[in-house]
Amino acid sequence: MAITDWPIEERPREKLLNRGAHALSDAELLAIFLRTGVKGKSAVDLARELLAYFGGLRPLLEASQQDFCQAQGLGNAKFSQLQAVLEMSRRHLAAALEQKTSLTSTTAVKQFVSAQLRHRQSEVFALILLNTQNQLIKFVELFNGTIDSASVYPREVVKTALSHNAAAVILAHNHPSGIAEPSEPDKAITKRLQQALQLVDIRTLDHLVVGDTEAVSFAERGWI
């Protein structure tokens, strides 16, 4: 049955307008993004099949261009639209963070860092640079690859912080394995960076390790 034959209140677009996006299922939200189905399938039917094919909404959103475009009903145009939506979401979080008078909420910082790093396929080490009022100056990605004491250079971290006149920093990196629990090398490099930054009077407020479903805070663990 075509969606146009459904009761008006059950059609995804009308349901969203009347009840809010939160009231829709993953399949209904995806159907609105798809706009149309394929021969013999409504947009909602196609959306359900795609969610089953990818294993859920998140794997679909994080799929590579090649994997995404191989699925029925998808292609480069939809992939481009999706990437634009995801990037707007990340920029929205960044803008919201910039507007805060100070970054005193670990939850807000976790949400921002997770949006930036959780989807990355390789490890990325980044800095959140803050001024004397703990306001955001800039989010900077510094290193890519295996993050350990041999690949993260304290000199580059200090240089970047000084070049932006940062008074404090929050360290962040992701674990592509999906497990956010910090490793011993994570703890070792945090200590090295904290010591290097102290030499130039720059405070290290936290180190966040991002996994699939959570971000672990060194500060909350009492390690900083």
Curated annotation (Swiss-Prot):
Residues 102-224 form the MPN domain. SUPFAM superfamilies: JAB1/MPN domain, RuvA domain 2-like. A motif (JAMM motif) lies at residues 173-186. One of its GO terms (molecular function) is metallopeptidase activity. CDD domains: MPN_DUF2466. Keywords: Hydrolase, Metal-binding, Metalloprotease, Protease, Zinc. The keyword Transferase does not apply. Zn(2+) binds at H173, H175, D186. Pfam families: RadC, UPF0758_N. GO terms for biological process: proteolysis. The keyword Metal-binding applies. Belongs to the UPF0758 family. PANTHER family: DNA REPAIR PROTEIN RADC, UPF0758 PROTEIN YEES-RELATED. This is UPF0758 protein Sde_3678.
